[in-house]
Amino acid sequence: LEAAGYKVAIVPQPDWHGDFRDFKKLGRPRLYFGISPGAMDSMVNKYTANRRLRSEDAYSPDGRHDLRPEYPSIVYSNILRQLYPDVPIVLGGIEASLRRLTHYDYWKDCLRKCILCDAHADMIIYGMGEKQVVSIAQELENGAHIKDLKHIPQTVYLCKEDDIPSGINEDDILLHSHEACLHNKKYQAENFKHIEEESNKKHAQRILQAVDNVYAVVNPPYPTMSTAEVDAAYDLPYTREPHPKYRGKTIPAYEMIKHSVNIHRGDRKS
């Protein structure tokens, strides 16, 4: 975003208790809020496989385990919606990517709907998001409304059936509705198969799922980035350091990876 000429304000691990002052520290954004709950799935990071609270968060200063809520994308988004009701909210990162359609929640032992429904956010960027964040910023700067951004690849949004671009057509994959999956486990299994297959295709189809009288629409991903595009992203002058807020504190995960190099990129599933 900075390379494209935009200013980015980063608020790390805001305090979600009390008066929400952390969410107001840097004021109202000109274009949109972007929410990412972290490099690891937030619930895996917070709980063990036995559903016990972990004693340490390797991604937090001094390993503290109490600096992020459960499902931070949902918590942060609802707070921002309360404070700035008319500012667009875009979810990204592994938490939203893996919850973009009906999904099984291991900790609640139930099926949950597309995370946009609970977070009251406007859009999800799934997978790697270098192109989408810039495209969204450019569209909003040119006067587009967030609800009209239905054409950006590798994004997810909710809309009514009549507002789906080109309508539901034979090239789309129409999944069983969320409500149907709640009553039939086989429907969820069939959905999961389609989602996995499309996530691994070079040329994927658009996926739609009915939920709460609207549709979750998953646009196909961007084509694989070229060598020049990958180099352009990774050659930017990153500091590769923790946020200045954590100066003087130890972040266990950073100590482990601070001399590491990238050898691969995340896939389009997450």
Q: How would you label these PLM feature ranges?
A:
Residues 190-263:
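N-terminal [4Fe-4S]-dependent radical SAM core
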Residues 1-2, 33:
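Catalytic alpha/large subunits of respiratory electron-transfer oxidoreductases
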Residues 11, 92, 126-127, 233-236, ...:
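Generic beta-strand/beta-sheet core signal
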Residues 270:
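Conserved small/polar residues in nucleotide/adenosyl-binding loops
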Residues 2-8:
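Short helix-loop-beta junction
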Residues 4, 79, 83, 136-140, ...:
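Generic, well-ordered alpha-helical scaffold segments in large soluble proteins
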Residues 12-212, 218-223:
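Glycine-rich beta-alpha loop elements in corrinoid/cobalamin-binding modules
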